Structure formats: C-alpha cells, structure tokens
Amino acid sequence: MLQIASGNREEGQVVELKKTKYLPYLFNLVMPKSFYHSHNRIVVARLYSNVHKHDKQAAEFFEGFQTPCFEVPASMFPGEAPLNKIVFMPPVMLPMGFEAGGVFGPGVLPRRSYPIDLTASGHKGQSPPLFVGLRRLYVQLPSEIESFLDKMGEFPATQDTLVYGMRRSNQLLKEEQAQELMLRNDLSLSMAYNLPAPPTPPSPYPYRHVPVQYNIYTPDLSNVLMMMPHQRKLTVAILSTVNNPHVPSVALATMGDEECPKFELPSDVFPICEGVNRPIFLPRRFLPKGFESGCVFKPGSLSELWFMGYMGRFSPPQPQHNCAITPPLFVGKISRVVLAFDLMKNIQMEYGAAQSSAQSEGSLNAVEPKKPNVPITKGFLVMETEHPTPPSGGYSLQSYQEGSAKGCVVKVEKGETQEMDEAHPTKEESKSEEEGEVQSGSQEEKYLSWFKVDSDIDLIAETMVDMGTAQMSLIDEEALPGVDGACVLNQLREVFEDRNEIRQNIDQLIHDHIYRMNRDRMLALRLPIRTCFRCGLLPCRHF
C-alpha cells in the first residue's frame, strides 16, 4: 500500500540523526516496478511493526551521523501532520534505488493526519509506521529483482492516479439527513465524460512533468460532455484532476479582460466560500458543450461532509492525483438556446472518428509538418540616391528588375518642383531643353539602393529626409492585383511621418494593459490596491 508524488532534493542537503526509538532496516523493501520508471520520485509506503522491526544496534551506531534529507510534501498528508517528527535514515538502511528517506514511528502520526488510503477501514489502536522516500533519478535494479517484479506483476495499489471515495454515511450526525442532489427538482447530478483525444506524434524531446498544485484550479472543459439523466437549470459534476488538469492559459483568461458569465449559486446548497476557496467562473470558450456559464470549485475547497450530504451514493468516482482532499466540482448553467441533443450518439460519433484517426495515424513514427512553398520576401523598398555608396542600412542595386526579384514593391525618387515662368513665355522651349539636359545628366549620376523588410525604419526615414522632396510609387502595380496602390502609399507615408506618435500610443496601450492586469490580480488575491509614490503605477520596480 503506497502513494507516490513528484519531488526533488538539493545536493548536499543533510540533517543530523538524533536518538530515536524506531529505525528499521529497509534495504530489502521493494516497490512496484512502475514506480521505478515513473516521473514521480517520492513514495509514501505503510510499514508493519512485526515485519519492519526497530534495529537498536544501528540506531546507537548511527546516532550523530549526517543523513540525507529532503522536503516532505505536505499535500500527501491530510490535516496538519507533524512532518518535523520524521527520522531520516542513513543511506545503507534505505531501500534499493533511494537517495534519501525517513520513517514515522508507530503512533507518531495522528490518525487524522495518516494517509487515508494506507490504513484499513477497521484499523484500531495507534497508527502504523510510515516510510517516506525519494528515489534516485535513474535506478538500475539487479536482474533477480526485475524478474521477480515481472512475475508478480503490477501491485493493485494507487500509483499515479487515485479514485476518491466517500467515507461511510454513518459518520454523519444522527440529526442530519442527506439532501442528495438527485432528489431535487432544480439541480441535476452529471458525469463528466472526456472525449478521446487524437494520438499525438512522438517527440524526440521528453516532456517535463508539471507538478500538481491546488492554489488555483482552472481546467479546460471545452472537450468534455456532461451526461445527465434529467435536464435541469443547473447541473453539478465531479471533475478529475487527471483527466481535467489545471491549464494556466485558462487562469490567465479568467484574470484578464475576457468575459466570464456568472450566475448566483443556490445558497441552501453551496456554502459561502471566500478567498482562495471561492468558485472561479470560466470563459464561455472553455465551458462544456451546451452550457452558457459555469464555475469550478478547486480541490479541497468543499468539505467532505458536504460531499457526503449532497452527493451521497450517486456520486460517480473520478481518478484523482491526491485522495487526501476532496475532488474539484463543476457547477454549470445549461443554455436554453441550444436544443437538447442525444449525448450518447454524439459520443459514439466522436469515439468512432477518434478510432479511425488513431488507426490511420497511430502507426506513424513521426509526422513532419508540411512546409508551404511560399517565397520568402526579403526586399521592401528601392531608393534612388546621388551617391554611389548606399545609405546606412541599405544595399546597392543594379536595376529595378533586380529589386523586384528581391521582393521590393515600393520605389522612392527625388521629387522635382516644376517652376513655371510666366514672365518669359518666349523662352519656354529653350528652358525645357536645358531641363532635359540636366535631367538626363542627373539620371546618369543616380544610383539605386534597396532596403530589407526588417530594416530600421528610422534609417529609411532619415535617408528620405536628406533627399528633400521624396516621391513614393509602386514598382509594378500589375504584380499586385486587387491592391489599392494610392491607399497603400498613403498609409506608408503616415507611418514614416507619425512613427514616433504611433510608438507612444502603443507604449501607452501596453502600460494600460499592465495596469489592468495588476489591478485584476490584486482584486483576485484580495490585496489592497496601492500605487507607487514615484511613478503612480501599480506594483513596479520601486516596491
């Protein structure tokens, strides 16, 4: 009988072994084979006093020695367990494959703090001894032990997932009566059914295990179907921390600007939960199908007495990571716009589609994403300059055809003012001839430079300012069908001229968003809203 959880230990973390009344020799203690291959490294196993006896000679010999230790997770013990009473053992007395571990002697842990699933229902007397150990990252067991574990098979213990079970109803007070939700007309009890997900292609990189935490619990229920015998206005369902894990993006959506539809919970059924135990309403896109609003109670927020009174014998079991606390609960309001549909038929269709996709894709070793055959645009703008050396940030170019091949779509030329001399109309012809000669000479002295898409816009704008009057036009309008060239050039000109103002507006929008996020975070955590006395903003670097 054991439970496992994730954990680690800092190198060199030791503690002095003091005089103790219980120090067994556990080198021959063997765990299930799946534990040695699991990403969870901490195990809590029950010991038996008649089998794992106290080694008095070893306790006297190792008294005062430095023994490896680690932080024992409090989430594996219900209530307030005296974790400081653990006795960490020397490495030679630990089971094979463990780098640190300790024991709680018989009667050290109160019965209310002893793991629920590790004691028999009819156990009497003092609490049995308990072993808490941290496995090494890589364990190589002897071949004899591996063959023994293969013959024994997997232990029918709670390995990675546990099924939360209610205690017997005789623990209720005699004057209290169970008010099960199945007997009410305004609420219904549902069972959360997770649609089968399509198989994911194997990845060469191992996935990092995310530790289970219950400070906040916001699952994504968009792929969950609620199966209910009767359709009522509100429905209640027990969720699974294994099948419906916490999703950080959903938590950010609830604390951001996204709308979370709310409704009033029946006060005669649900207690008033405040602070971290309050129900969290989810955005509409993360709700199950057919629901217009819904909220989630995180694990441990509702008492076990409430589950026994209102869920009773009708509560469907769901796998949980930790059975020491009550499971999460979903309360949803059914949408009146969506018509009732056959859930079983929908489940069969989804399951059939998942099976067909699994048969077609499950045998593939790896799925490489298709690369679209889209040419990468490198160039952006071609500019005529009077100097052979290209401007800062630009590159030399031979012709407009070469610029078009690089992806350039805009060309910039130096504008020339046309001065009309009305006082000397007889000299128009000679003046036009002189201008033609100057223009031809200037054309011979002009050079082409091009800028990339990711070039510095300030350098491009400064070069255009040095040109004086600059005129922008499209290199080839026929290559851009359906594009309003005049509108594009107008917007580009505004970007060049008002770029500083645009940056200031974007910076202000970012600061406003940060202010709203900090304010909503403080409201969610019930913290007083304080502004910085220097900059007038919410928590900043001056705090």
From Swiss-Prot:
Keywords: Repeat. InterPro entries: DM7. SMART domains: DM7 (SM00688). The keyword Repeat applies. The keyword Methyltransferase does not apply. Residues 415-443 are annotated as: Disordered. Residues 415-430 have a biased composition (Basic and acidic residues). Belongs to the DM7 family. This is DM7 family protein GG19680. It comes from Drosophila erecta (Fruit fly).
